[in-house]
Amino acid sequence: MAEVIGYYGTGRRKTAVARVYLRPGEGKVKVNGKEYESLNDYFKNPAWTKHAIEPLEVTNTLGKFDLVIRVNGGGLSGQSGAVRLGIARALLQYDQKLRPVLKKYKMLTRDPREVERKKYGLKKARRAPQFSKR
């Protein structure tokens, strides 16, 4: 028989996808099957870590859950945003009363910005080749 997982949320940002499981616990972190002291050990950049755990901070649930995260695609910045949305959605499964707080800080909104495709005849998505008058 499978063990009880807890609360689940999926988050996406750019090309990153995160599946987040919250289990009642004391704040352990497991990312892609590997144990970490904190999320900072995975993301390295403190700004990305702070961004990812923001939903736990604003809802005062920081030490109440163990995080089990499967994240792939994109870079660390996009993964941080995906984890953030996944945690916020999992917290809603835990308690619907947290919705106004999470909504106030815009944590339930999927950031729709994606990389614009490169067009032919241009060097990048919008950058045209250098123009010479003479």
Curated annotation (Swiss-Prot):
The keyword Ribosomal protein applies. GO terms for biological process: translation. One of its GO terms (cellular component) is cytosolic small ribosomal subunit. Residues 120-134 have a biased composition (Basic residues). The keyword Ribonucleoprotein applies. Residues 113-134 are annotated as: Disordered. This is Small ribosomal subunit protein uS9. The lineage of its organism: Bacteria, Thermotogati, Thermotogota, Thermotogae, Thermotogales. The gene is rpsI.
